[in-house]
Amino acid sequence: MRRSFFCIDSHTCGNPVRVVAGGGPLLPHVSMAERREIFVRDHDWVRKALMFEPRGHDIMSGAIIYPSVREDCDFAALFIEVSGCLPMCGAGTIGLATVAIEEGLITPRVPGRLSIETPAGKVDVDYQLKDGFVEAVRLFNVASYLHSRDVVVDVSGLGSLSVDIAYGGNFYAVIEPQENWSGLDGMSASDIVTLSQRLRDALSVVCDPVHPDDERIRGVHHAIWCDAAGSENADGRGAVFYGDKAIDRSPGGTGTSARMAQLYGRGRLGIGDSFRNESLIGTVFEGRIEGAALVGGIPGILPSIGGWARVIGHNTIFVDERDPLAHGFQIR
């Protein structure tokens, strides 16, 4: 049996976003949080086939479009990447919104705005359209907050590190320069991957954060290594790690949200403040704290992220059960 998937490929500030516009598995008409559980249980082979080699690669990410059960949303989305099926993905949302509008997949109820149901909740996206193309997008992300301060772990190759745990749609370990880590300068991509893997393993022993409003969202699977900006167009720089060995090419939407929540929790950003976050390749997301929020009684923020994406092609992908590598593979 051969299954086909119609995909539209894009990138958000350098990070790939593969939008599955046709062929995704049929799921019950329930919330996206419930659909995510069903997808992971029964259909994770789709994620692996579309994200892993030979059809994808180590940093591939994407989204599958679904109808929403919410009357206040235009559509719904599941976010998939090499590491799993995520509650939320900021870069993925920016790419998804750009594809949905430029390719005519969705007709928004309100021109200039899309409302999307995600497993993490409803997110709104404002977009600027010029000559039929989406020039810029601003994502209004889910409520974000600082979960834990100064979690001390021993990381082989560095020694003792103090990290914060923050939520921006996914839980992040937030690392700032300190005695045993001087910053991103001089770190290779291989260094970031190796140290992130060790950090995540060490954190898993001492810290297992759970979202206060949804216990299905738990655990630190992402890290953001933060440093001073590399250009005058940014306020900070970060390397986002996820999966087994992936480094986000964009500044990271949920990562930038988590970083702003951490800075807010430490009193270094306030309501209405902006934070321009630079990626390793020099692209920038403009974050802004739109308002305050309570997340299970914990003070947090309502972040927005400004960025852009570009459509790069159409792709009909076949998954043939006769193929011994039909469901993809990874080299670890």
Curated annotation (Swiss-Prot):
The keyword Nuclease does not apply. GO terms for molecular function: 4-hydroxyproline epimerase activity; trans-L-3-hydroxyproline dehydratase activity. Belongs to the proline racemase family. Its EC number is 5.1.1.8. It catalyses: trans-4-hydroxy-L-proline = cis-4-hydroxy-D-proline. The active site is at C89 (proton acceptor). Disulfide bonds: none annotated. Pfam families: Pro_racemase. Substrate binds at H222, D248, G253, T254. Catalyzes the epimerization of trans-4-hydroxy-L-proline (t4LHyp) to cis-4-hydroxy-D-proline (c4DHyp). Is likely involved in a degradation pathway that converts t4LHyp to alpha-ketoglutarate. Displays no proline racemase activity. Keywords: Isomerase. The keyword Isomerase applies. This is 4-hydroxyproline 2-epimerase 2. InterPro entries: Pro_racemase_fam (IPR008794).
